[in-house]
From Swiss-Prot:
Pfam families: RadC (PF04002), UPF0758_N (PF20582). This is UPF0758 protein VFMJ11_0123. PANTHER family: DNA REPAIR PROTEIN RADC, UPF0758 PROTEIN YEES-RELATED. A motif (JAMM motif) lies at residues 173-186. It comes from Aliivibrio fischeri (strain MJ11) (Vibrio fischeri). The keyword Hydrolase applies. Belongs to the UPF0758 family. InterPro entries: MPN, RadC_JAB, RuvA_2-like, UPF0758, UPF0758_CS, UPF0758_N. NCBIfam families: PRK00024.1, radc. Signal peptide: none annotated. Gene3D superfamilies: 5' to 3' exonuclease, C-terminal subdomain, Cytidine Deaminase, domain 2. One of its GO terms (biological process) is proteolysis. Keywords: Hydrolase, Metal-binding, Metalloprotease, Protease, Zinc.
Length: 224
């Protein structure tokens, strides 16, 4: 059945405008993004089918171009549109932490870092560079590695911190395994970076380890 033949209150776009986006199911939200269905399926039916094929909305949003375009009803144009939505989301979250004290808005910082790192298939090491008021100057992935490790060089962290005239930094990296519990290697590299940046009067304020649905803070555990 075409969406136009559904009662107005059942059409995703009209439902969103009347009740807000939180009232919609994942399939209804995806249907608005898709706009149209395929032969024999309206946009909601196609969205429901795609969610079952991908396994979840998150997996669909984090898929690469080849995987995305291999599904019927999706193509390069939709992939480009999706990447624009994802990038706007990341910039929105970065602006939120950029305008606030990174220490007094830890939830925004955690949300941003989770969005940046959680769905990566390889380990990535991310640094937030802060000024002396703990406002964000820049965020950058400095190192990327294999599925279970990234080579991290303290001297490069020092160099980039000086480049951005940072007074403090926040470290973060993901565990592609999904388990956020920090390893002994994580604790050792944090100590090495802390010692290195302290030589140029820069502090490490925290190190977050991002898992699947969990984030561990070194500062909250008293390790920094």
């Amino acid at each position: 059945m075409s969406l136009m033949n559904l009662p107005e209150e059942s059409r995703p776009r009209e439902k969103l405008l009347a009740l807000g986006p939180k009232s919609l199911t994942d399939a209804e939200l995806l249907a608005i993004f898709l706009r149209t269905g395929i032969q024999g399926m309206n946009a909601i039916e196609l969205a429901d089918k795609l969610l079952k094929e991908f396994g979840s909305l998150r997996k669909l949003l984090s898929s690469d171009e080849n995987e995305f375009c291999s599904h019927k009803g999706l193509g390069a144009a939709k992939f480009a549109q999706l990447q624009a939505v994802v990038e706007m989301t990341e910039r929105y979250l970065f602006e939120k932490i950029e305008k606030e004290d990174a220490l007094t808005s830890p939830e925004h910082t955690k949300r941003y870092l989770t969005r940046m790192l959680r769905d990566r298939h390889r380990e990535a090491f991310y640094v937030l560079f802060l000024d002396n008021q703990h406002r964000v100057l820049k965020g950058e992935i400095l190192f990327e590695g294999t599925i279970d490790a990234a080579a991290v060089y303290p001297r490069e962290v020092v160099k980039r911190s000086i480049d951005y005239n940072a007074a403090a930094i926040i470290l973060a990296h993901n565990h592609p395994s999904g388990v956020a519990e920090p390893s002994q290697a994580d604790r050792r590299i944090t100590k090495r970076i802390s010692d290195a940046v302290e030589l140029v009067d820069i502090r490490v304020l925290d190190h977050f380890v991002i898992g699947d649905g969990e984030i561990v803070s070194f500062a909250e555990r008293g390790w920094i």
